[in-house]
Structure formats: C-alpha cells, structure tokens
C-alpha cells in the first residue's frame, strides 16, 4: 500500500515538474531563449496553444459565423466586419503580404484629401446655428467652440488608436476596421455584439436627425425668403421632400459625389456673403452685448449645438484606413480642427455682434430681405444636395444591421439574387424619407433639434464612447495624464450631454406648447 502511494505521489510530482518546466521554457522562449529539451519544447507548444485558446476561446461565439456558399473568401482574407464577425487578421507573413496587396488595390487618398473630407464634415451648414449659441453663452460660448475643437481632435486620435494593437514582435498593427469593431471588442467576451449595436443605434439616430435638420432648414429658409407667398413652412418642407424622394432609389454614392464640389462652393459663397454684410455694419457692432454670464436654461442647448458642429468620428476609421500615409492622420486632425476653430469662432462672433439680442436660430434669417433671398437659395441648394449623404449612410447601416447579417438578420434580405433592391425594400426607403418629412413638419425648430442631437448622439460618439473605449482597450499602455484626460472628458461629456438633452427637450416641449413656429 505504501509503495502504491509513493508511486502515485511520484507520478504527480513528475507531472507537476514537467508542467512547470514547460511554462518556464515557454517564458524563456518568448524572451528569445531556445528550449533545452524536446520535452520542454513540446510543453511550451502545449502552453502556447492553451494561451491562444485563453485569448481567443472567449470570442468563439462571434467567430462562428456562416460563410455564404459561392464566393467564399479565403481564410487569409477574412477580416473583422462592421458587426464584429469574421476572423481577425492573421499575423503570418504570407497573409500580411496578401493584405498589403489587397489594400494597395484600393484607391488611397492623401492627407490633404482626408483633411478636405474632415473639413467638409465639421464646416458644414450647421455653423449657421453657432451665433445662436453665442447669444446664450457669451464669451463662454466662444471658449466652448475652442474647447470642443480640442476635445474632438483628441477623441478622434484616441479612437483611431483603438484600431491598433501590438503584435508579438512589438509592431503596431491594425486589427479593427470600424467604430463598431472597437465597440464590440470592448464588450467582449460577455456581450460581444452589444457595443456594436449601441454604436449602430447612435449612428442611425444622428444620421436620420441630420436628414431631418436638412428638411427643417429648407422649409424654414424658403418660408423666410418669400414671406409674402401664401405658402407655409410645412408646405415648403413637403416640396423639399418631394425633390428628395428619388434618394430612395440610390444604389451608391457615385451619382451624389459629383455634387459635393457644388456644396462646398455654395457654402463658401454663403459664408462670404454673411461675413461681408456683417463687416459692412462693423460700426454698429454691439460689443457690450457679449456677456460674461450665461443663461442657465439655454446654455446647455448651446453646448449641444457646438458639439454637433464638430461631429466627424463616425467616418474617421474608414478615412484613416484609406489614407496613403496613416502616420499623417494626427497632423491632418490638428490643422483641420485648428482651422475649423478659428473660422467658426470668427463667424459666430461677427454675426452675433451684428445682430446681438435679435440673433435668430438660423443666422441668415437676420439678413435684409434682398440679400436673404439670394443666400437662402444657396443654402437650400446646399441642404438638398447634402441630404443624400447621411440618408444613404443611414440606409446602409439599417440594411447591414437588420437585413444582411445572414442567419442572424432580424428580417429577410432586402436584395434579390441578382443584387436588385426588392420592392418592399424600396418601400421602406421611401418610408424613411417620409419619416424625415413628418419630423420636420411637427418639430420645425432647427436650433433645438440640433442641440438635442448634439447632446444625445454627438456627445456620445465624440466624447463619451471614444474616451471609454480608449480606457478599456489600452489601459495598460496609458500614462497617468492620458487616463486623467479620458476620465475628465467622460465626466464632463456626461454632464453636458445629460443637461443639454434635458434642456433641449424642455425647449421643444415649451415651443410645442406655445405653438412657436420659429
């Protein structure tokens, strides 16, 4: 009996010794030393397999996706998709070469072209609401224009940093492709799809609200341009939507991209006309009207307006991935946001000094009737030409989330086998256009809607989520001041988001209760 016990104890001790030697050998092997014996090498291989299973096994539920028959991609070419499915890119040299070749076939853009895209996003027509923000914020509103530029530039950079990780060789490689991938990585392994769904919902809300704002501003501008005509603002919005209804038939953005230059030209013409008129009245500028105190009830709305005018984080991952030199991304973000900060600050201040307490939600409504009609026609043209971009993006997110996820889709595919859109899918697109019209008719308040959207989704996508994801994914690599910045942005963003949302909602309820048209 004693011999049997000694034998078992000896076997257990030998097993434990072998495992410990294998772990030590594995650790040394990672540090560059070779294993001493074949047994230790075998133990290290086993430990490495266990380590791989430990790191990847928790995500097996999102890796088990069905690859459709037919054009099945090769194993080395499968990447993380928008919803977080698919295998992560391999670290092998052959597959890395394949990915480089495939990426080289894509049209690459320069840092200047990327900066132009960011500038178009953050220098859009929504800057027309910034003088209204100065009305309720005074000098603090000007400070917030600068502060929001700094924070949005920083959060854009850390959002891109979340796309990368260090491999075993210490090299930084891109392992994620989109905002949704980052969100899914943060919520894995317990809720591998929750983060992506939250980001998708926020994106859809922001894109649809942007479409609604375009319809609202079109109806508002046309009504104020021709006040003598017996046509109400709602009727102008209906006519604008009738022009926009063909957007439901869009298959891609090739037909829309040619109008982007016209949008930019129209925007510069509008800014030049407004600033030229303001400069012509420089002698009457009311410097004494710029307050150092704030309207506690209205100022949170101003925060939402300012934040919404800087939103660009949605498309930054795709933009950075298509740059010829991604290392220039940080420099591009710096000069685009510096330029935006200067131009927005000057535009808002000059416009407010001209009209002071009479500043309206859309600053062009303050212009004389003769100039206003010309400027507003340019604005309406820009709004109508800009509508297809967020509309198509919202449709794409909805289709991929609800109709094109294979076995996980909530509804059947809205495209037929020949790639054509089914009739009921077209009906849903038309319904989305009509929905933007109904919202514009029943909530025709440009600044309040802009503040509501900026406080809800703008602050979330630009402030809260990037800082939270940065802390979650890169906690071990962050320095103390980076942690401080992220936590501060998250706390301040949360306070501004909640207060702005509540006060914007109160403003909408008040405007609706008192039947305020503008």
UniProtKB/Swiss-Prot annotation:
Q: Which UniProt keywords apply?
A: Cell projection, Cytoplasmic vesicle, Membrane, Neurotransmitter transport, Synapse, Transmembrane, Transmembrane helix, Transport
Cellular component per GO? cell projection; cytoplasmic vesicle membrane; presynapse; synaptic vesicle; vacuolar membrane
Q: What is its main location?
A: membrane
Q: How does it sit in the membrane?
A: Multi-pass membrane protein
A molecular function (GO) held by this record is: glycine transmembrane transporter activity
Could you list which ranges are Lumenal, vesicle topological domains? 147-197, 280-298, 356-376, 453-454, 504-518
Q: Does the keyword Zinc apply?
A: no
The molecule here is called Vesicular inhibitory amino acid transporter
């Amino acid at each position: 009996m004693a011999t049997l016990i000694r034998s078992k104890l000896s076997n257990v001790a030998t097993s434990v010794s072998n495992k410990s030697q294998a772990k030590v050998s594995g650790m040394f092997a990672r540090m560059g030393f070779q294993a001493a014996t074949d047994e230790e090498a075998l133990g290290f291989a086993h430990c490495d397999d266990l380590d791989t299973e430990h790191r990847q096994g928790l995500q097996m539920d999102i890796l088990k996706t069905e690859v459709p028959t037919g054009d099945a991609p090769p194993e080395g070419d499968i990447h993380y998709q928008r919803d977080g499915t698919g295998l992560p890119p391999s670290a092998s040299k052959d597959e890395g070469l394949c990915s480089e070749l495939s990426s080289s076939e894509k049209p690459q853009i320069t840092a200047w072209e990327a900066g132009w895209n960011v500038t178009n996003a953050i220098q859009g027509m929504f800057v027309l609401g910034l003088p209204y923000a100065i009305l309720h914020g005074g000098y603090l509103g000007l400070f917030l224009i600068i502060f929001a530029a700094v924070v949005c530039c920083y959060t854009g950079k850390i959002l891109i940093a979340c796309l990368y990780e260090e491999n075993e060789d210490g090299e930084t490689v891109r392992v994620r492709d989109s905002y949704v991938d980052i969100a899914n990585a943060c919520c894995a392994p317990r809720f591998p799809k929750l983060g992506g769904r939250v980001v998708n919902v926020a994106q859809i809300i922001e894109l649809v609200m942007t479409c609604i704002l375009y319809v609202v501003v079109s109806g508002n501008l046309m009504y104020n341009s021709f006040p003598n005509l017996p046509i109400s603002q709602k009727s102008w919005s209906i006519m604008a939507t009738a022009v926009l209804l063909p957007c439901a038939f869009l298959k891609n953005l090739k037909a829309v991209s040619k109008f982007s230059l016209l949008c930019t030209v129209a925007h510069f013409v509008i800014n030049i006309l407004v600033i030229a008129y303001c400069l012509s009245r420089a002698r009457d500028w009311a410097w004494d009207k710029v307050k150092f105190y704030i309207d506690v009830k209205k100022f949170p709305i101003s925060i939402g307006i300012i934040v919404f005018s800087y939103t660009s984080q949605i498309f930054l991952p795709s933009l950075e991935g298509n740059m010829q030199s991604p290392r220039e991304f940080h420099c591009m973000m710096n000069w685009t946001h510096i330029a935006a900060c200067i131009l927005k600050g000057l535009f808002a201040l000059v416009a407010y000094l001209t009209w002071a307490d009479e500043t309206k939600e859309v600053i062009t409504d303050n212009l004389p009737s003769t100039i206003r009609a010309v400027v507003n026609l340019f604005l309406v043209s820009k709004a109508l030409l800009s509508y297809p971009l967020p509309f198509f993006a919202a449709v794409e997110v909805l289709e991929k989330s609800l109709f094109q996820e294979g076995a996980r889709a909530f509804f059947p595919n809205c495209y037929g086998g020949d790639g054509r859109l089914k009739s009921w899918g077209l009906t849903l697109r038309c319904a989305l256009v009509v929905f933007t019209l109904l919202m514009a008719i029943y909530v025709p308040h440009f600044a309040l809607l802009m503040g509501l959207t900026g406080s809800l989704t703008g602050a979330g996508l630009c402030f809260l989520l990037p800082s939270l994801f940065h802390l979650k994914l890169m906690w071990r690599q962050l320095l103390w001041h980076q942690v401080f910045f992220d936590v501060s942005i998250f706390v301040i963003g949360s306070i501004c988001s909640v207060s702005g949302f509540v006060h914007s909602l109160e403003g909408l309820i008040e405007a609706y209760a008192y039947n305020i048209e503008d």
